Amino acid sequence: AARSLAQALGRKADNLFIAGLLHDIGRLLMVVVAPDDYARVIATAREQDCPLQQAEMSAFGYDHADVGAALAQRWNFPEDIRQALAFHHAPSGGTPGGPAGLIHYADAIAKALDLDGAEDTQLPHLDPATIDALDLDQHTLARVLAETQEGFDHCSLLLG
């Protein structure tokens, strides 16, 4: 979704594609470091019908975006990737039309198409400033949705 969206907006897609792949890497680290605690976070999110990041904050005092941003900083990732990982759930913390906003929107597209396989069953709230900043028309959005689904289907065939 991130690559298709970046291309549709005339942005350089390489780092945005990488940011899209890595935007939830903090979640992976949290699962690896504290699997039992994270299983409880997932259960809490389901029981309370709340976003996973809200349940993460309640349980840990930080969320996967914070962990991902810390990893990106430690690994000396470019600033646009760090911003995307840090603010993909709250793009107004960065620049709504910037990398975080684009990943925020791409994440919503992946969730809407049910491509993410996430335990989180809620569609993310799209940040209004991001919607305004990216200014996608219906035709472009339809094309991005179709390209994203097609790309996912192609990768699924390749990976079996």
Regions found by a protein language model. Name each.
Residues 3, 7-160:
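Metal-dependent nucleotide-binding catalytic modules
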